[in-house]
């Protein structure tokens, strides 16, 4: 039911696309000149075209191999800070659902990057982080510097918020460790991994051919399918509910998940609330009830689709007392479809508060949502009068959606709002929208306290890579989003908080250096 603009349909590009770096052929994989050449062989085999880095001597062997053996592929992006390098990879992963390489120097570069790694972990972003240490061979260490920049078990510094880390002891261990790291990283739920290489191991001459993985080997396990019997129960609950709500958070990590949710909503004619970790559902769709909190008092069933944060949308926080009030009607039922406890860590508390679920289903929503749609269609087909009843519900939702969007857009042109200083979020969102609305645009992260989401026409999956994260993350992730769309010729818009940029103003140099087009609209709140 959602409509697309001309730009979304691909009839217009904002600028000339910049093609991806072309991968050169390496004829003798596993038999280069130096051990670090084997790492490059694996990077070529796993097809990751970019590597964001801040150079350091601990991986000078790998750096040399990337240039002289790998033909400068992956393309190396010089960054002003390791944190920014990881954030660029984070934004790229958000926008493409594919991993990117970030390379960090020794212990100090790893420690510089660890906040960005933590945010990638809690945001489930697949980032292949390469680091280096040592030399562990004491006789090869340079005075002082190699001693103070080396740690025993260096991966321990980020082990609590990465999915996997490894440090191969021999060159023959490099391919298997790399392959396992990639598999762990890309198995849902995704997350960053850290691969550490000893400095002297990289620089030693390769004296034998290393056994490489078969090019036909499966790199990642198949997606996890949910239990059919439990899915049938969920479908019956969804069909019998008077006012169900689909609560989506990470189901939009892929185009397939986005499209599947549209089909499910159109089948069931029910409300959808997008928590915006990724763009899960079109903002222009008449069943999109995101940011319309008054609907919660009518909801009798919530179906979470790859949702971690159940509490924030379903409760009202009283900040002064740190207490919460439920928004939900008494007797509302809850069904959780996603990865449940598979990501849980004994260290990080990102798993949120435990909910009283009526059904809990483990499975990938890329599979579960189409399965749920099929089951619901079968129930509709054999239940007389149900289809017209559902369509009537959909019409009421569409009326509320249209009314709310009209009110939001009026707020952006309201005379009193336009006199406020600093500029009101609704006004700034409106002004930017009037300039970009006929382009094929992408919003990188922050949405001006969701006013861009209220006013702009989010009519395609690529429009938004997901909501903003913590302070000092937006400019870096925005560059990664812009890099991901660089070959599409789209207009990339970053609604940039001023205080966030001050953490890493050098990021703008990275954009200029590596030809990453992006419109940065600075929101200065006159504070920080």
At which residue positions do the language-model features occur?
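Thiamine diphosphate
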Residues: 139-150, 296-298, 369, 451-528
